[in-house]
Amino acid sequence: MTLLKSLCVFFFLLAISFTFTQAARFDITNNCPYTVWPAALPTGGGQQLTQGQTWSLDVPAGTTSGRIWGRTGCNFDGSGRGSCSTGDCGGVLQCKLSGAPPTTLAEFSLNQFNNLDFYDLSVIDGFNVPMQLSPTSGGCTTLTCLADKCPDAYLFPDDNTKTHSCPSGTNYRLVFCP
């Protein structure tokens, strides 16, 4: 019975350790002198951030094809329906669709090949808000895009030099108007 109990405890701790080392937190801060409504897929939906506010978004382990972008010029009613001048996602505050161009995108896939997170910035869909994406540990590369056609971002789909990696379990900071 002791062996069975020990094995159960071991596998429980292993499962918890595996989950926590792969999940990531994205702290999204608006430093712009205007309101930004960040949106996140496939988790997170959307939120309003005035200058200086931060939204902490916990992204589950194994998330692939994640996107975060800023929306501008938004107006929503009490039920979360409305529209945005840039980055609109079907007229709702809590996005379930990608944003309409132009959108500066932060893209990520967590715990992929060799236990790495992959991340990038993209202006393929256009540029709307200056953005910086920085891993908070691991000595990984910080990406900054202050204007259209910025050198740190994807400009065309097959630009394989723009994807970066960091060990799984890394947390990230995304800043609008860094």
Model-derived regions, located:
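Extracellular low-complexity, O-glycosylation-prone Ser/Thr/Pro/Gly-rich "stalks"
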Residues: 2-178
